[in-house]
C-alpha cells in the first residue's frame, strides 16, 4: 500500500507541497516551495524533516503553477535521501487546497462531475481558483492512479446564517448565479479552532473565538460554539480587510470613478469598463502596496515609519480590524473565550498585536508585553500572551498550518477519514 499523502497549496505566484506519512497522526516527511513564479528568477525552498533548509534561486524557466509543481515533484522523486517518495506509486492521495468551493460544504474527491463543477466556479473566482485547478488537471493527467481530494477555504463558513450570507439584491438573480457571502481562509480557521480549543481544554462546540488571519490576504472570523457565524470576506476574498494588494471594503461604485476621467462619469464613459479590469485594480493594484509601494508589512509595522504613507497604511488596517472586533464581540454577547492572532503578520507583528490590544482595553483585553514581544517558539502552536487571568478574553497567537490541516486524519474502522472540521471524506485503506 502507498505510504504517503501529498498536500498541495497553489497560489498565483507560488506553489508549496508537503509530503506526510499515511498514518494517524500524519508526520511531515519533506516540504518544498517555489515562489516568484511571476517575478523571476523563481526561488526554491526545500527541507527534509530533521535536516537543514535548502534555498536557492533557480535557473529553470518556471512560468506557470504547473511548471513549478512538476519541478517540485521531480526534485523530490529524484532525491536519493527521500526514499519514501521515489515515485507515483508511493502516493496514497493528493490533497489540494482550493479557495472557492461554491456551495460545497465538505471536502470532495475529484472525478469528472466534481471537476466540472469546480470549473464552472472559475467565472465566480477567476483570480483565486486558477492555480489550484491547473495543478489538479495536471495530476489527473500525469498521476492518474493517485486520487485527488479537494479542501475548500469557503466550506468552513457554510454554518453562517442566511441573514449574514445574503446580499440584499434580487434573489432570483443572486441564487441563479451563486451571489452571496462565502468567506475564506476556512482551512486555517478550522486548524485554529481545533488547536485553540485543545489549548483551552474546551470542547470545540463550546468554544467562542474572534480569530484574525492577518497576512498579505487578511480576514477575521467569529466562531460561536465551534461554528463560523460571520467572517469579513464575502463573495470573493476581496471583501473585508485591506491586504497587500487588495482594497478590502470600498464603495462599490468607486471603481467606475477610478477608471474614468474625474467629473466625467457617465454611462458612455463607463461602457468599456469590464469586470476583469475592476478585479485587477482592486485585487492587485490596491492595498498597502498602492499606499506605500511595498507589499512587505514588516516595512510598515515599525515604531518609526519611514513615511506618512506607511503610517497611514498601518492605521487603516488597525481601524478596519477594530471595526470587526467590535462587531463580533457584540455578536458573541461578550462571551469571548479568546482573541486569536494568526497568519504571517498576525503571528510575527508584535506592534500590530500591541496596538490592537491597547485599543481594545475597554473589552477587558490586556497583553503581557514581554510575552508579546517574544512571540511563539517554532514548535509552539498556541501561545498565550494575555495579562491578568480571568479579567477578559484570553489573547492568543496561533501558528496556523494549512498544509497539515489538509492531512489531519483519524482512524475509523476500515477507513481513514480526512477531516478539516469541514466535514469528512472517507478514504479506503484497501
What are these regions (language model features)?
Residues 159-260:
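Glycine-rich phosphate-binding loop of actin/hexokinase-like ATP-binding domains
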Residues 223-265, 274, 280, 343-390:
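Catalytic phosphate/nucleotide-handling subdomain of diverse soluble enzymes
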Residues 75-92, 198-203, 325-337:
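Phosphate/pyrophosphate-binding loops at sites that engage ATP/ADP/AMP, CoA/4′-phosphopantetheine
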Residues 76-128, 147-149, 155-166:
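Short beta-strand-loop/turn "lid" adjacent to the catalytic site in phosphate-handling enzymes
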Residues 10-11, 97-99, 214-216, 339-348:
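Glycine-rich beta-strand-to-loop/alpha-helix junction loops that act as flexible
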Residues 267-271, 280, 284-332:
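Adenine-nucleotide phosphate-binding core of ATP-dependent small-molecule kinases
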Residues 311, 315-337, 346-430:
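Internal helix-turn-beta structural module
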Residues 1-104:
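N-terminal glycine/serine-rich phosphate-binding loop of ATP-dependent small-molecule kinases
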Amino acid at each position: 500500500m502507498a505510504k504517503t499523502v501529498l498536500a498541495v497549496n497553489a497560489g498565483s505566484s507560488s506553489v508549496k507541497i508537503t509530503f506526510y506519512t499515511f498514518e494517524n497522526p500524519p508526520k511531515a516527511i519533506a516540504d518544498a516551495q517555489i515562489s516568484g513564479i511571476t517575478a523571476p528568477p523563481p526561488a526554491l525552498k526545500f527541507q527534509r524533516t530533521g535536516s537543514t533548509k535548502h534555498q536557492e534561486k533557480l535557473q529553470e524557466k518556471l512560468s506557470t503553477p504547473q511548471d513549478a509543481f512538476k519541478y517540485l515533484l521531480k526534485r523530490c522523486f529524484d532525491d536519493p535521501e527521500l526514499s519514501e517518495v521515489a515515485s507515483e506509486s508511493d502516493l496514497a492521495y493528493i490533497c489540494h487546497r482550493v479557495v472557492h468551493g461554491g456551495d460545497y460544504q465538505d471536502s470532495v474527491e475529484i472525478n469528472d462531475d466534481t471537476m466540472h463543477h469546480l470549473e464552472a466556479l472559475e467565472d465566480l473566482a477567476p483570480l483565486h481558483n486558477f492555480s489550484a485547478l491547473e495543478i489538479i488537471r495536471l495530476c489527473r493527467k500525469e498521476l492518474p492512479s493517485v486520487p485527488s481530494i479537494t479542501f475548500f477555504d469557503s466550506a468552513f463558513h457554510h454554518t453562517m446564517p442566511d441573514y449574514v450570507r445574503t446580499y440584499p439584491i434580487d434573489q432570483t438573480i443572486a441564487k441563479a448565479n451563486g451571489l452571496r457571502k462565502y468567506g475564506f481562509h476556512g482551512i486555517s480557521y478550522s486548524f485554529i479552532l481545533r488547536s485553540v480549543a485543545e489549548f483551552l481544554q474546551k470542547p470545540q462546540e463550546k468554544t467562542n473565538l474572534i480569530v484574525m488571519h492577518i497576512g498579505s490576504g487578511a480576514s477575521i472570523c467569529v466562531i460561536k460554539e465551534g461554528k463560523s457565524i460571520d467572517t469579513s470576506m464575502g463573495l470573493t476574498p476581496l471583501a473585508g480587510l485591506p491586504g497587500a494588494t487588495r482594497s478590502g471594503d470600498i464603495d462599490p461604485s468607486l471603481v467606475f470613478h477610478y477608471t474614468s476621467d474625474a467629473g466625467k462619469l457617465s454611462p458612455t464613459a463607463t461602457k468599456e469598463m469590464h469586470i476583469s479590469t475592476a478585479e485587477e485594480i482592486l485585487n492587485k493594484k490596491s492595498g498597502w502596496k498602492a499606499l506605500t509601494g511595498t507589499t512587505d508589512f514588516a516595512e510598515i509595522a515599525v515604531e518609526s515609519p519611514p513615511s506618512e504613507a506607511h503610517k497611514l497604511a498601518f492605521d487603516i488596517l488597525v481601524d478596519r480590524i477594530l471595526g470587526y472586533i467590535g462587531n463580533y464581540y457584540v455578536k458573541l454577547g461578550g462571551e469571548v473565550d479568546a482573541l486569536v492572532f494568526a497568519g504571517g503578520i498576525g503571528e510575527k507583528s508584535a506592534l500590530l498585536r500591541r496596538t490592537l490590544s491597547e485599543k481594545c482595553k475597554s473589552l477587558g483585553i490586556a497583553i503581557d508585553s514581554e510575552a508579546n514581544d517574544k512571540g511563539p517558539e517554532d514548535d509552539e502552536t498556541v501561545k498565550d500572551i494575555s495579562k491578568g487571568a480571568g479579567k477578559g478574553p484570553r489573547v492568543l497567537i496561533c501558528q496556523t498550518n494549512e498544509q497539515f490541516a489538509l492531512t489531519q486524519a483519524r482512524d475509523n474502522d476500515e477507513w481513514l477519514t480526512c477531516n478539516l472540521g469541514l466535514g469528512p471524506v472517507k478514504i479506503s485503506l484497501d
